[in-house]
A protein has these predicted regions:
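Short, small/polar-rich loop/turn modules that mediate ligand/substrate recognition or access, typified
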Residues: 183, 188, 245-247
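Substrate-binding pocket helix/loop in short-chain dehydrogenase/reductase
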Residues: 79, 107-108, 112-117, 215
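Active-site helix of classical SDR
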Residues: 131, 167, 175
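Conserved glycine-rich cofactor-binding loop
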Residues: 16, 23-25
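Short C-terminal tail/terminal secondary-structure segment
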Residues: 2-8, 156, 235, 246-259
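The beta1-alpha1 cofactor-binding region of Rossmann-like NAD(H)/NADP(H)-dependent oxidoreductases
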Residues: 48-49, 70-82, 113, 228-229
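Residue(s) in the substrate-gating loop at a strand-loop-helix junction
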Residues: 151
Length: 259
């Protein structure tokens, strides 16, 4: 048997990644993971000061090039601009992680149509717009990895989450459709479906008794996911180790969807 590449498949040295919503939470964790594997990274956020600070921290910690750019992924012009800026900075974009997203909670009677629309604009339109902007660059290179951040709520239901669950279900189907559309171009498209992670957004509710009861009842491992536990999935899908994966959903949910 000829030698197999093994762990070398996960090496991202020489790759350039663009991560939306990269200033904090899972986006920043994934950016750090990719940089630790050798990639140069561009992070985007709606808040310029936050994303600039995050990029500087990644660059200092891992010794890779890291740039922070302000962008609203629901704005087509912003999506085109950051793709051009990232491509100009690094000469290419090998990896796109569509991570930017928002959430809202409430019953269908409580929520307004405007609140519903705001979630869909960021979580669905933003994914499509970023993919639309980056695909021509990847096609020209004959290589690309598109990673969409979906959710367990894209495949299972949860009350009082209709806008978010609807948006993530759309991301699941967009991932599959794009995977088929791009299969012959050298571009793969996969999704990560996180379960409950202890992100900065969730820290305030982590000690709530009702939340604790839900985590124990729904998650097989009976705990929150930690930030570093998303990194392996991102590195896998961004690297050559996932070359035979496209249209796949990678469940990183502590066993929630195994029940």
């Amino acid at each position: 048997m000829s030698p197999l590449p093994g762990i070398k498949q996960f090496d991202l040295t020489g790759r350039a990644a663009l991560i939306t919503g990269g200033s904090k939470g899972l986006g920043l964790a994934m950016a750090a993971g990719l940089a630790s594997a050798g990639a140069d990274v561009v992070l985007t956020s709606r808040t310029e000061s936050e994303v600039s600070t995050a990029a500087a921290e990644v660059a200092e910690q891992f010794g890779k090039r890291a740039i922070g750019l302000q962008a609203d992924v629901s704005a087509p012009d912003d999506c085109r601009r950051v793709v051009e800026q990232a491509s100009d900075a690094f000469g290419k974009i090998d990896i796109l992680i569509n991570n930017a997203g928002i959430n809202t909670r409430g019953s269908i009677e409580e929520l307004t149509y405007e609140e519903f629309q705001s979630v869909e604009r960021i979580n669905v339109d933003g994914v499509w717009l970023m993919a639309k902007a980056v695909v021509p660059k990847m096609k020209e290179a004959g290589y690309g990895r598109i990673i969409n951040m979906a959710s367990t709520l894209g495949v299972v239901g949860l009350s009082n989450r209709t806008p978010y669950a609807t948006s993530k279900g759309a991301v699941v189907q967009m991932t599959r459709a794009l995977a088929l559309e791009l299969a012959a171009t050298g571009i793969t498209c996969n999704a990560i479906c996180p379960g409950p992670f202890l992100t900065p957004m969730n820290v305030p509710i982590a000690d709530d008794e009702q939340t604790k009861k839900f985590i124990v009842g729904a998650v097989a491992l009976e705990r929150w996911g930690q930030m570093e536990e998303i990194q392996g999935a991102a590195i896998l899908l961004a690297s050559g180790a996932s070359s035979y994966m496209t249209g796949s959903l990678l469940m990183v949910d502590g066993g929630w969807t195994a029940r």
